[in-house]
Structures are given as C-alpha cells and as structure tokens.
A protein has these predicted regions:
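Histidine/acidic-residue-rich, glycine-tolerant segments that coordinate divalent metal ions
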Residues: 3-6, 12, 17-133
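Short N-terminal signal/transit or membrane-insertion segments
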Residues: 1-7, 53-74, 153-157, 161-170, ...
Length: 186
C-alpha cells in the first residue's frame, strides 16, 4: 500500500530537526514492468540523494531483502498457417515451439537451485482451434538475485528458444520489453 510509504516519510520527518538534510518521498506507480524507478533515475529524480529506502508492503517485516535483477522478454514464433482439418500437413504450428519452450523452462528450473526463475504467459496462441497458427507469442520475465546469474539464465532461455524452433521447423525472434532492473541489496 502506498500509505505505508507516506507514513514512513512522516516518521522520518519527525526526527529531522535532530538531523541535517531533507527528506523526499517518491512513489513509483506501474513498477511491475513499467520501469518506475529506472525512469525516475534516468530523469534525475535521485540526483543529490545520499540515502534511499525501498518500501514494499508485505504481511511481515523484512529488513534484509534483495530486489531481483529482472529483464522482460517478448518471444515470437513463426510457422505456416493451415486449416487443421482439411490440410494439416500444409501447416507448421507456431504454437508447438512455444509449448516446448514452457516445458524446457520447467526442466531448467531443476538446475537453478533457487538462484532465479523464468516466468511466462502465452500472450498470443492462435485465433481458432481449427487453424494451425502461423504466429504465436509469449511474454516472459527472467529474474535472479544478481545480474551475473540473470545473464546466465537469459542465455539458457534464448538457447531453449532456438532449440524449440529447430525442433519444430519454425523461426523465432525476441526483444526486451521495457526496462532491465539490476539487483538491489540492503
């Protein structure tokens, strides 16, 4: 809740007469995928700031937390559309590699030892079950406790995309979606 942030600001302000300096309170709307803090940083909101706190509502008090390193990805697979009932042999499903990718991610989790995760959704999976989809899309987020590990997970993920496309005779492309976040440690 944003009210937690404002209450913390009021509490710190109450002891300011004993301290030198000033206090500023920033809210970051649309933080999940919106790049709130990154945009504010790029526009100088934190210039001259000596100390910063991140406050996030939770059902418990957490003092020593880590904000994940994160990159959001959009992956598109391209096949050849066809009528599934009449000419299925003419089609190359763009959905098949996307489904394989999700299976591959599930298996890769076993190797990551809790150091990160890849989460995703099918954002475009075709329009009608009777048509073999020519294009399908997934949206993913790659997250880890460190940029180094996140880069490794991202590399594993892109290799899985390539493998899924090769296995199904499709093509693919990817792009970053939004802002990359570095890990933040207390």
């Amino acid at each position: 809740r944003s009210s937690d942030l404002w209450h913390a600001g009021i509490a710190v302000k109450s002891v300011l007469p004993q301290l030198k300096g000033s206090i500023s309170v920033f809210g970051t709307p649309a933080e999940e995928g919106g790049g709130g803090k990154v945009i504010m940083l790029e526009n100088g909101a934190f210039n001259g700031v000596d100390a910063a706190m991140i406050i996030h509502s939770a059902n418990e008090t957490v003092v020593n937390d880590i904000s994940y390193s994160r990159t959001d990805i959009i992956v598109d697979f391209f096949g050849k559309g066809a009528h599934a009932a009449t000419w299925p042999e003419e089609g190359v499903s763009a959905l098949d590699p996307l489904l394989l990718l999700f299976q591959h991610i599930s298996q890769m989790r076993l190797r990551w030892n809790g150091q990160g995760t890849i989460l995703g959704i099918i954002s475009e999976g075709g329009e009608d079950p009777i048509h073999i989809p020519e294009h399908c899309q997934g949206k993913f987020t790659v997250r880890s406790f460190s940029m180094k590990t996140k880069k490794k997970l991202l590399g594993d993920f892109l290799e899985a995309c390539e493998a899924a496309a090769r296995m199904t005779g499709t093509t693919w492309q990817w792009k970053e979606d939004g802002y990359t976040y570095e890990d933040i440690r207390n």
